[in-house]
Structure formats: C-alpha cells, structure tokens
Amino acid sequence: RNCIIVDVKMNKDNLKYNRILLKLSGEVLGNRETGECIDPTRLAFMAGQVKKIHALGVQVGIVLGGGNIFRGLTGAGKGVNRVTGDSMGMLATIINGLAMMNALEAIGVPTRVMTAIDIDKLAEPFIQRKALRHFEKGRVVVFAGGTGNPYFSTDTAAALRASEIGADALLKATKVDGIYTADPKKDPNAQRYGSLKYEVALEKRLKVMDSAAFALCMDNGIPIIVFDFFDGDALERVVMGEEVGTLVSDK
C-alpha cells in the first residue's frame, strides 16, 4: 500500500490569510557592521521568505521603510526641513522597493513596483484596480513612496495600502518577536503580549507602530501581526494561522 505524506505547512487549503500586506523595516535591510545600506544577504533572505508564501498562493503586497538610507524625522533634527526630509525618505523607499523587486524576480517571483509619487520611468503609479489585477495574475506588488505625503510614516502607508487592497492582515516584520510591555533590550522584566486590542495599543502608545497606522487598521478591521522576520519560517507559520508574535485586533 502506498503511503501519502501531506506536509500541512505547504498545503494551500490551510491558509488563514489569502492576501496580506507585509511591512518590512528599511533598517532591517541595512548592515551597520559593513556600512551597507542594502545588505545583499539580508535582501535575498527576505525575498526567499516571500517566495515561500507566494508559492502557497498567498497574494503579497509589500511596503518597505527607508530608514536604512534616510529617515525624514531624524533629518529634521539635523537641520533638514521636515517636508524635504520626508520627500527624501519617500525616495529611499523607492530605492528599497526596486531592490526588492530585483531580488524577487531573480528567484522567479513576478513582481511589480507601484509608487505613491510619479516616477514613471522606474515604476508604475499606484492605482488600486491595477494593483488588484497584479494580484490576480500572481504577481507580488511592492508599494513604494510611502503615502506620497510628508508627515506620514511608512507604517501608515502600510495600513493605507492594506485597507485599499482589502488585505486579510497587515504583517509587520521586525527584529523582535512581538509587542512587549517595555523595551525587552532595556527591561529584563518586559513581557510579550500574545494578543491585544487596537484600543489598548493606542491607549498605551505602543511604539511598534504609530497611532495613525493603528487607527486606520482599527477603522477597517484589519488585524495586525507583529513578528520576528528572522525567526526561520515565521512568515509561513503566520499565514497558516499559527500563533506567532503578537496579534492586534478587535477581539
């Protein structure tokens, strides 16, 4: 008798989230030790993780930060006009977006970059219906350029795009394995939340995302999952519905 072994992890029928918005910190792309703004090894790892869930049939939208290149808020403290600084930051996210597209396509994942500011020789402008069409055709879509406006973070851009594309969840990939009561690097007694409500996250002003991003997800009923991107197959486990990191929702 032949035995059929089913790998539950790779079974498309077990997906909990069919369309996700993945928020990746720009700082995670950089390497402070080597001074590289974009570390090829880290970029390749990220692309490989995205490929795994794309192969499962998950429709993937990605928003990248730009902190590895330039952060508008930091620049404002060093004499750069805030609006100009944020514009520089938005351009940084486009650089990261093009790098991610290149890394994904190098491993066979069809990808498009859509920007919030017109830069048509490099990428498509963001048009909601066109983005949905890309998903239908099996493409990963990288949303770059933030919201296209100063004073809005890339976390808020991620919440906005997640709302516009009707994402089942916003997955925020960080260097830590969830949201804590305090900074675990500074406070040894800090405890990780398994789950919490949007209102609590807003009330406690938890710094993992800004209040505008939390509020936008709350208003549109989009759950947020904060997890450690470098924890092996964490991304796969999240889309399968396993309890990974911290879940922020209305429950």
Predicted features along the sequence, with ranges:
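C-terminal catalytic "cap/lid" subdomain
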Residues: 8-251
